[in-house]
Amino acid sequence: MAGAIIENMSTKKLCIVGGILLVFQIIAFLVGGLIAPGPTTAVSYMSVKCVDARKNHHKTKWFVPWGPNHCDKIRDIEEAIPREIEANDIVFSVHIPLPHMEMSPWFQFMLFILQLDIAFKLNNQIRENAEVSMDVSLAYRDDAFAEWTEMAHERVPRKLKCTFTSPKTPEHEGRYYECDVLPFMEIGSVAHKFYLLNIRLPVNEKKKINVGIGEIKDIRLVGIHQNGGFTKVWFAMKTFLTPSIFIIMVWYWRRITMMSRPPVLLEKVIFALGISMTFINIPVEWFSIGFDWTWMLLFGDIRQGIFYAMLLSFWIIFCGEHMMDQHERNHIAGYWKQVGPIAVGSFCLFIFDMCERGVQLTNPFYSIWTTDIGTELAMAFIIVAGICLCLYFLFLCFMVFQVFRNISGKQSSLPAMSKVRRLHYEGLIFRFKFLMLITLACAAMTVIFFIVSQVTEGHWKWGGVTVQVNSAFFTGIYGMWNLYVFALMFLYAPSHKNYGEDQSNGDLGVHSGEELQLTTTITHVDGPTEIYKLTRKEAQE
């Protein structure tokens, strides 16, 4: 009987495979670091204060800050007083992008944060728990001389969190509050060339709308979008990796179906992991270049969630199926305690994402964090997911500890074997430990590169070479997990080579039909493994 490929592979061949995968891993990092630009670009926008002198402020007219049909504008709020311009007559206008530039579908998404410049006035201070209410209209067009088409119109409330560091005295009037930035807008596609934002701050003293919010001098926006060059590199990687993982997945399942036994749990989970990786890799983002698919961000979150849930489940089942004790765990029900937190945590994060990006499909200005109830609800989902994640890692660490402890304990039986047979078993145990350490190394590398990308400036310079650290993080880690899944399906595919055929004169001292594989879950037609029989006998004694 043959075991998995990793059990029949010599150390030399295993090192060759590892070396090839390492080369591809280095290439993945270099593609992002040397070829791709930074993942995102941030652009600052200063709103232009336009004057709407009409009595009825309807949305039939769009106020453009510059160009041939630019609005009647004022430089600052003080200019409005002698011209008898009221607060309700002022429209803060922002044109996206800046002059002489165009947006592109390659930018994939637009995220905007808002910064209010609020001056201190003794007779108009910011009250406690103040809320600014904005009437926001968003329009688009694809030609510089075409008419604007409305895309969204919403009332956007945001709570102010401002502090004034100087004493509140007359001589400090005119100084600005220090206010937190506010989430403003998120769009999941950039299907048009030009966008226009018209922001009003309507004042209604009877209804206490925009009362006690200080004197707002200016509105600033920071727009963040994905770089087109990075998008092309990212799409190219997904296009290359999709057939690679799909082909190895088909090959893996074909070898399993050729066996005389049904697939065991570990093999099914590895196959499911390959499916989830393929689901992430399929480059459906290519269609976003020609179609206005605003749901792509949400769809991407769902795909990643499915993959991470499968990856976490695989680690638990991988450890459990190599526990080497008297318990049989060839059923997913045997892991309900460990897999349960994964399911609950994933569900909580899915609900949170639907409450945020799901609502943004119809209202790009929505944020669950802008209200007390929304914030409490979001924090509840995140805390529950965090608790589930902690429980999962406690279970995982405990199972990894048990596996290594059991392996160390069972090694006491090895000296009684013949030399060749003992060396073979020691090799199997070494390869299992090696794969466990590779898993930990992949997880550690993900965390390390994430931290490095957050604390660095985004790029390093060595002489005339610039390395984009953030891009290298995205492409390198993405390539790493693809290689990880590829290696799992290749190394853990059933081998069609029998040990008896590979070793002359029965050097291993094993009877015909006796298994020498490490996987401990095959208890069907082919019988249990040699290590499983050995360790189970000791456990029963």
UniProtKB/Swiss-Prot annotation:
GO terms for cellular component: cytoplasmic vesicle; cytosol; early endosome; early endosome membrane; endocytic vesicle membrane; endomembrane system; endoplasmic reticulum; endoplasmic reticulum membrane. It is a multi-pass membrane protein. Belongs to the wntless family. The chain crosses the membrane at residues 16-36, 233-253, 269-289, 304-324, 332-352, 381-401, 432-452, 472-492. Regulates Wnt proteins sorting and secretion in a feedback regulatory mechanism. This reciprocal interaction plays a key role in the regulation of expression, subcellular location, binding and organelle-specific association of Wnt proteins. Plays also an important role in establishment of the anterior-posterior body axis formation during development. Residues 101-232 are annotated as: Interaction with Wnt proteins. Changing I531T: In ZKS; results in decreased secretion of WNT3A and WNT5A; decreased activation of WNT signaling. This is Protein wntless homolog. Changing R536C: In ZKS; results in decreased secretion of WNT3A and WNT5A; decreased activation of WNT signaling. One of its GO terms (biological process) is cementum mineralization. N-glycosylated.
